[in-house]
Amino acid sequence: MESNMGSKNKIYVAALPIVDIDFYSAQDVLDAHLEKAQKVGMVYFSTSNRLNYKKAQKVAKVLLVSKAFTYIADVVSYTYFATKTTPLDAADYAPRIFSNDEDHHWLKLANIRPISLDELNTFEMVNKKVQAQYNGVGNYIKNTGRLQVFYATKTF
């Protein structure tokens, strides 16, 4: 049997900033998603952020980030709508406060858990210049002035 000990696995990750929305704080937004995921096993996270459709299709995990918290989740499915839309099963999987939202990007997430900045430093920014400047995703989140969507990889 051939061994593949030398080969490495690489996963792609997208970081999505969680921000205040209308009357909801970033923490409220996170909590609503955590509650729904706990109830039904998965949750929709929708965004109109400028996600790159081609990159987003390759993403295995998502980081939900703010200055106050960082979480990681598995991507169960990713759906892109050219025209902002609500998926048919949004009522089943989106937090109630967002189940009528129309958005371009809908990611169905599972296994959402907190992740430390130290553990995040085992991920590398795809942008080599930013990676060289911050030396890890955790350092970037902690020290950058403004969080935006970014992509990272982890090799193991």
Please place each PLM-identified region on the residue numbering:
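Residue-level detector of functional hotspots within protein domains
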Residues: 48, 59-61, 93-98
